[in-house]
Amino acid sequence: MASSKAAINLQDIFLNQVRKEHVPVTVYLINGFQLKGLVKGFDNFTVVLESENKQQLLIYKHAISTITPQKPVIFSASDKDEKREE
């Protein structure tokens, strides 16, 4: 079994890529709401989304069903060690 330091966290890699590349996303919540915008930051429990009208939204990950990027995201395991916020 891999150690926790060597484990690849696909969720963090995905969120970091869409954040760094300013890829617009649609966040589908478990209650059916859709939120569109840019990922500005994230941690273990939350995602900060900047909506199209520049409003910042703090979304708890347990409320998220799906995140759909507007364009394909290239995954790179080396991105997991980069910092999460600019």
Swiss-Prot record:
Superkingdom per UniProt: Bacteria
Name of this chain's protein: RNA-binding protein Hfq
Keyword field contains Disulfide bond: no
Subunit structure: Homohexamer.
GO cellular component, one term: cytosol
Positions of disulphide bridges: none
This protein's record includes keyword Cytoplasm: no
Similarity annotation: Belongs to the Hfq family.
GO biological process: one example: regulation of RNA stability
CDD domains: Hfq
Job description of the protein: RNA chaperone that binds small regulatory RNA (sRNAs) and mRNAs to facilitate mRNA translational regulation in response to envelope stress, environmental stress and changes in metabolite concentrations. Also binds with high specificity to tRNAs.
Record SUPFAM superfamilies: Sm-like ribonucleoproteins
Keywords per UniProt: RNA-binding, Stress response
GO MF terms, alphabetically ordered: RNA binding
Ranges where the Sm domain occurs: 12-73
